[in-house]
Amino acid sequence: MVGGRRLGKRGSPLLRWSVKQESFSHGFSKSDLQALSSICDAIMPPVPLESLNLEMKLKVLRNDALLSFFKSSSSESHVRPDEVAELLATKAIPLTVLVVRIVLRILTFRLGTLLLCGLVCLDKKHWPFLLKFSEMSLEKREKVLQRWNTQWYNPLARIGFMMIKAIFLFYYFTWTNENSENPVWDAINYSVEIGENEDMEQKERPLDEGIIETAKEDEMTIKQRMINKGLKVTEDRERDTYKIECDAVVVGSGCGGGVAAAILAKSGLRVVVIEKGNYFAPRDYSALEGPSMFELFESNSLMMTHDGRFRFMAGSTVGGGSVVNWAASLKTPDAIIEEWSVHRGISIYSSEKYKAAMGIVCKRLGVTEKIIREGFQNQILRKGCEKLGLDVTIVPRNSTEKHYCGSCSYGCPTGEKRGTDSTWLVDAVNNNAVILTQCKAEKLILADNDANKREESGRRKRCLGVAASLSHQTRKKLQINAKVTIVACGSLKTPGLLASSGLKNSNISRGLHIHPIMMAWGYFPEKNSELEGAAHEGEIVTSLHYVHPMDSTTPNITLETPAIGPGTFAALTPWVSGSDMKERMAKYARTAHIFAMVRDEGVGEVKGDIVKYRLTKADEENLTIGLKQALRILVAAGAAEVGTYRSDGQRMKCDGIKQKDLEAFLDTVNAPPGVVSMSKHWTQSFTAHQIGCCRMGATEKEGAIDGKGESWEAEDLYVCDASVLPTALGVNPMITVQSTAYCISNRIAELMKKRKKD
């Protein structure tokens, strides 16, 4: 609802679910779909009221929507197997799709079912005494899923089940009809609310003056559109390529690329920004979790570490991560600045210019610590900390003090959060920069440096621009020739572009830090009237608590609250049984989360869609320390029940609990491995910060780029995103990334001015 009105068709069609499809391209057979449907029915079966405890039974009987929710099965719901299969086939990482295909195909055969399910598929009464999975009773299918959930020696079934469960439940709780309605939202007390903003319905979007949305163009119009924006364009018909001449090309439009584009355009350079995502303004955001996460996030928000332990949340739209982040605007800690400047010898952090840059960035983003009203989860974090005598810190944010938007992770529909799309990129466009959307950088254009240049710069190569591809609407390629090239694709994509272009530095793709997190949850029944609201309401991060390990003076662990819509909640929640799943969802709106985020020592490596990452022993210990502290805070705040995201549904009732019982429970808490592990218990979490992979180094051996942001291998090639940061920093990195980009791009601007004079 919006101000008492239904959302209806608000927002871009790309950020709403499409109407029911009649044809599909998923490639699953009818038998595969039958097996898929049978799994989904066992995940969300009808639940008899007599199986519920008294408290839940009374709650269900008082609420018609909840009663209908408990009585229904997935096959009777708004979700069709074809649609779940289509999402799996088109959105998930190919390797996981292959696993799902294999599992479903095996289950279409009787012997295959015996292989994956064991003797539970035997039927002594009917020939041939073996049942296919779809022929088994609902109770037996549920038992099979419970086994798969714990069987480390059957990784194929466990991974396949995890993926089907995640996609199915995510779609089940995020699906909407053409009026943005979902029949189960009333049951779980969820609604999509958007505050009013007088600028929300403005006709012209902030970047319209400089943006070219290539998906809306064809081969006949795209060239003229670029010329109309003032670009010098020629056509190479033999290569089916348009050649563009400019001073600077920026690949990526997020926290790093947006700042670089603004600074370089302001200095008088002709700047072209290319972005593989689409452009949306506040009026375009639907606040709908499902389609927004698939459209606005890298790899549809389904990219994971190799062990399935962490999902990556990285922006893939004009504005990048600043569009989908949670507005936390924390400056680089002094201890980190000292480490990078003194111990690692990175010159950019050793001067007062960097600290001044942080002030300039915060001013441009309108960062404030003022807040009129805290949301449900932050109230709980604050209350729990105060009860325990712990320090709680107000989080600076790049939003207004009255901002109360719980859906900023899907793009801020009120426009009160100031991402690069409404700040730095506006500055760039106002200084004649051009932004091309749905434009993907394929390769950097590198040439051998001549002998004099090589001796002068010490670099064997020179970057001359970028080769890029456009949207599916045209086969034309782009060759963007530039005097300077800035890569800002983020830590997950920048390494691949550099490596595929022929750069060989050993630090490229390595040294990834992810600020890993583990979440704790606490259920606060409605009778607790002191804590108002619901988990999905209010600004996402307004309070935090720093946990200090006994042997450290630098906070390596931070406790914050996340954005977690019903789809994400359902996808991540451990599945113990169909009844338990429905009970957890019935409590969704009053289930608060606190996560522990660690400044990790462990490092990873990015190779395409595969991210290899391992925590160190110290990281594991810090996550466990943070998770236990989060649980203590939730209990102190008055939770009736608390738990973790361990696959067995680890939890504890809190009413009347004694301290010794709490400590006994906490002794069982740890940071479990991922689904691929050889462990009975596993977990899945997410990470919103990806750092490193092209880090700065004082020497070529220590980093992929130098202390001024330039590649050690290729002259006139710079990197301006989170991948340049030398280590993890332990706090939300937006201000650090933008301030680093500010310093790098100002140096580039000065260098270009000097060249012009020479």
From Swiss-Prot:
Its main location: membrane. The keyword Transmembrane helix applies. Pfam families: GMC_oxred_C, GMC_oxred_N, NAD_binding_8. It is an enzyme of class 1 (oxidoreductase). FAD binds at residues 246-261. It is found in: Membrane. One of its GO terms (cellular component) is membrane. The active site is at H689 (proton acceptor). The chain crosses the membrane at residues 102-122, 155-175. Belongs to the GMC oxidoreductase family. This is Long-chain-alcohol oxidase FAO1. It comes from Arabidopsis thaliana (Mouse-ear cress). The lineage of its organism: Eukaryota, Viridiplantae, Streptophyta, Embryophyta, Tracheophyta.
